[in-house]
A protein has these predicted regions:
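Short, low-complexity, polar/charged sequence segments that are solvent-exposed and flexible
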Residues: 78-84, 105-108, 321-324, 366-370, ...
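Residue-level detector of flexible, active-site-proximal loop/helix-junction positions
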Residues: 122, 354, 466
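Short C-terminal domain-edge/linker segments immediately following a structured domain
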Residues: 116-122, 130-133, 333-336, 379-381, ...
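Short acidic, gly/pro-rich beta-turn/loop elements at beta-sheet edges
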Residues: 96-98, 110, 313, 357-359, ...
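Active-site-proximal substrate-binding groove within the catalytic cores of carbohydrate-active enzymes
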Residues: 12-17, 157-159, 169-173, 177-216, ...
Length: 615
């Protein structure tokens, strides 16, 4: 921490933070409680303030009263660190609410390119105040512990003065952002969600200012904080728990499917060409593909297999077993497993313990997520049609039930994929016989990952999230936001590897290898020191798995590109990403450094790269 002089002053609705010679303003008049039918501003409430001074620091506690219900805010500075702490505490506040917006956003209104905001949506986004595109909508409405924020924090830098704001109780918190087209401002702040309808407990945030700062400095502040809190578990530590971690590093990622069956009430159902709603590739065909890839010289490979259960991909979960009968049944799956084992390749199955399908043979509405209004949630979105969400408290039991059956058939699993857990928001359950908070949901999801570890199976999920990192080893991808949009769509900001600057040496991230009209995504895989897909079918493919001449040429090129990425990953997977930046202030020319040893330079205008060792 470089800044040594911080003072907090209150002026009416404003809180002023004097950091050395820099002034940061926060208008508390913008804070409010959102109820179902109205919005109540903090400055409309009866309140009183008191100064607090003790052995830790000093600050101001404000007690608010609304309809004879009281809550308090406490803003204080920790003397030993100069960290600013924000606490929101229910005293006698038992009212149900939708959200509490506190603290307010900082004033950040200069139309300057070097006034930037750092957003942790997916891998990371940088937004200059002058950025040409609007950014006002976040994934999952900004809810922490989802892909809206791989890490529950954000930061802002004006010239070389900056801060990072960290949520310390993220499971019931979210954030919002307002950046209009061409700026001139970016406002970002946190809000508090009810836990089973109520405020329930003290919510905590931490604000850390930094002088002469940059993107890397703020990320390293966060990394230090994560280490202090025990969130930081390296791949080397995970490898001591399961030696397959080292085996996965440098592997070619192969994503393939077996059975597709799209029911009529799914939004993906093709009414014009109904024959396209079903597809089948046998386990034998997939085994032949594995043989073919081995003949191509691939020495390390991980197969992620979709739709291996009899109902087909995204159908009947959690009752997706037995192995797909039409594709060869348990014997066919065992043959595929043996083929992978023969070549020392790794095998993992797609699995799902959130989407709870009405078509499941054991479906029970009493195990489905009950909403606050006591109704059972339902939707018809994915291939299997009408579904609810499974109460997460039951997920560990279903995971154990299903994996015990798979392993009993001597299927050689060294990794597996529990869909959406680290991507989608946390769930609550309002069933009066068994209430579940979001924090408990998070803990139950982690129990599922830990069970896999107990079977020497590496756990993965759709994306990555800090709350899962003690157990999660890898994921389907950990991409930049724009990579999941069409190449010609407007971007929300400049892609930056905020997550990898903190956690690169803690998790394995595969990267898409697409070549669009303007960019080669392989460059991002190199910049981030990740691993590569050698082939990846979509979630709802309609393919036959056959190789033709054109496919052979394409496959040869994909293998060549994979080897470039894998060679680097094997050198840097266990190293911290120690530096990142732009060359000549050009966002299209970026560099990263791993362990102060290896530097990667990419040019997204020329689609070129350079890897420098022993720097």
């Amino acid at each position: 921490m470089k800044s040594t002089r911080i003072k907090i002053k209150h002026f009416g609705n404003y809180i002023h933070f004097h950091v050395d010679e820099e002034l940061w303003k926060m208008n508390q008049g913008d804070c409010f409680i959102k109820f179902h039918d109205k919005k109540v501003l903090f400055n409309e409430l009866t309140s009183y303030q008191e100064m607090i001074q003790n052995g830790l620091g000093e600050g101001i506690r404000t007690t608010y009263t609304y309809e004879n219900q009281t809550f308090a805010t406490y803003v204080w500075i920790e003397n030993s660190t100069n960290h600013i702490h924000f606490e929101l505490t229910p005293l006698s506040f038992n009212l149900e609410f939708d959200a509490i917006f506190w603290p307010a956003a900082f004033e950040f209104d200069e139309c300057k390119e070097n006034w930037i905001t750092l957003v942790n949506q997916m891998q990371g986004i940088l937004i200059p105040n002058t950025f040409e595109n609007e950014f006002t909508k976040l994934n999952f409405n900004g809810q922490f512990c989802s892909i809206a924020a791989y890490m529950p924090s954000f930061g802002q830098i004006k010239e070389k003065e900056g801060y990072i704001m960290i949520s310390e109780t993220p499971w019931d918190m979210a954030y919002q952002i307002d950046h209009p087209t061409n700026g001139p401002y970016t406002h970002i702040s946190m809000r508090h969600l009810p836990s089973l309808g109520k405020l329930s407990y003290t919510r905590k945030m931490k604000l850390i200012f930094d002088h002469d700062t940059n993107i890397v400095s703020l990320c390293k502040i966060y990394r230090k904080d994560a280490l202090e809190k025990g969130k930081y578990v390296t791949l080397e530590e995970k490898a001591k728990r399961n030696k397959n971690v080292d085996k996965l590093i440098g592997s070619a990622f192969l994503h393939k499917g077996i059975k597709t069956h799209v029911v009529k009430d799914s939004i993906f159902y093709d009414h014009v060409n109904p024959e396209k709603n079903d597809a089948l590739i046998t386990f034998k065909q997939r085994a032949n593909e594995i043989q073919h890839l081995h003949d191509k010289g691939i020495k390390k490979l991980y197969l992620h297999l979709d739709g291996g259960g009899d109902p087909g991909y995204d159908n009947c979960h959690p009752d997706y077993l037995p192995a797909c009968i039409e594709a060869g049944g348990w014997e066919g799956l065992k043959e595929l497993s043996n083929t992978l084992k023969q070549y020392n390749y790794m095998f993992g199955l797609h699995d799902q313990y959130r989407d709870y399908y009405f078509s499941a043979s054991t479906f029970d509405k009493h195990q489905a997520i009950m909403m606050k209004n006591k109704e059972i949630f339902s939707q018809s979105l994915w291939a299997g049609g009408k579904q609810s969400f499974l109460c997460t408290s039951l997920a560990p039991y279903y995971v154990k039930r299903n994996f015990e059956e798979v392993l009993a058939h001597d299927i050689h699993l060294e990794a597996s994929y529990l869909d959406v857990f680290t991507c989608n928001e946390l769930d609550e359950w309002f069933n009066e016989h068994h209430l579940m908070t979001r924090k408990e949901c998070m803990e139950y999801r982690n129990q599922c990952f830990d069970y896999l570890h107990s079977k020497n199976i590496l756990p993965s999920s759709e994306e990555v999230n800090e709350w899962a990192l003690k157990s999660q080893v890898f994921c389907h991808y950990g991409p930049y936001d724009f990579m999941l949009r069409k190449p010609n769509e407007k971007r929300l900001g400049i892609p930056v590897p905020l997550f990898n600057l903190v956690y690169h040496d803690c998790v394995i991230l595969p990267w898409p290898m697409d070549i669009t009209e303007n960019e080669d995504y392989m460059l991002y895989a190199l910049l981030n020191g990740g691993c590569a897909y050698v082939d990846k079918d979509g979630a709802y493919p309609n393919v036959d798995g056959a190789f033709n001449d054109n496919r052979e040429k394409q496959l040869d090129e994909e293998i060549r590109r994979y080897r470039i990425v894998a060679d680097l990953q094997e050198k840097v997977a266990n190293l911290e990403m120690t530096d990142f930046g732009f060359i000549d202030q050009n966002y299209k020319k970026q560099y990263s450094v791993f362990g102060n040893q290896i530097k990667v330079i990419i040019d997204l205008e020329k689609n070129t790269y350079e890897i420098i060792t022993n720097i």
